[in-house]
A protein has these predicted regions:
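Loop/helix patches that line or flank the sugar-binding groove of alpha-linked glycan CAZymes
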Residues: 1-142, 148-153
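Short, flexible beta-strand-to-coil junctions
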Residues: 137-138, 168-170, 189-190
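Short, surface-exposed beta-strand/loop "edge" segments at domain boundaries and coil↔beta transitions
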Residues: 140-141, 171-175
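Beta-strand-rich binding/interaction modules
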Residues: 152-170
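C-terminal beta-strand-rich structural cap/linker in extracellular carbohydrate-active enzymes
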Residues: 175-190
Length: 190
């Protein structure tokens, strides 16, 4: 997998309220061109907050110290104000953090050929908000289930499994009559 700067700790885009806060020349040029064509400032700022390249260029949020522990000088871009809550130091203190989840996922990928070389088989008849699929290689079978929504989703799979490999919520005993929590995801070995 590709992991972009800050993604491994859950860094989020830093919202801007005005074009004066933007450094990306492509965003600035697009803004000026579209203002001349009659687009609203609010609409353009919203687009820049979603797609602007400055989001991927923010300083790494190392700690909750001044400038997120990145520098004692002035950073080239303003920091996301959430750096006091989302930073490397804080993530390393929590064994259930995004950082450690990435480590587990990478380890599973490196240690299990079924992830890389296994056949992919979509589980049919699930809600549009649920992604469920099998990875199969020889005698190895893994089931991956993810609720892609911010709402509870129901799913009933009459499948037994040997072991929960990874989960972002508490481990399950059964896959029958599941009420998947918002954004719940897990993988089991069948």
């Amino acid at each position: 997998p590709y992991i972009y700067n800050g993604e491994e700790i859950g860094m989020t885009n830093c919202p801007v309220k005005s074009i004066d806060e933007v450094e990306d020349i492509e965003s600035i040029n697009m803004y000026r061109e579209r203002i001349d064509k009659g687009y609203s400032k609010d609409e353009l700022i919203k687009a820049i907050n979603t797609k602007g390249r400055d989001n991927a260029r923010r300083p790494m949020q190392w700690s909750n110290e001044e400038n997120a522990g990145f520098t004692t000088g002035k950073p080239w871009l303003k920091l996301n104000p959430n750096y006091t809550k989302i930073n490397v130091e804080k993530d390393l203190e929590d064994t259930n953090s995004i950082f450690y989840t990435y480590q587990k996922l990478i380890r599973l990928r490196h240690e299990n050929a079924v992830v890389v070389d296994g056949d992919f088989e979509l589980v049919e008849n699930t809600s549009d908000n649920i992604l469920a699929f099998w990875r199969k290689l020889e005698d190895e079978k893994w089931l991956v289930v993810a609720n892609l929504s911010g709402k509870k989703q129901n799913l009933n799979l009459d499948i037994s499994f040997k072991k929960v490999l990874i989960s972002n919520y508490e481990n399950r005993d059964s896959l029958k009559d599941m009420a998947l929590k918002p954004y719940e995801a897990f993988a089991v070995k069948a």
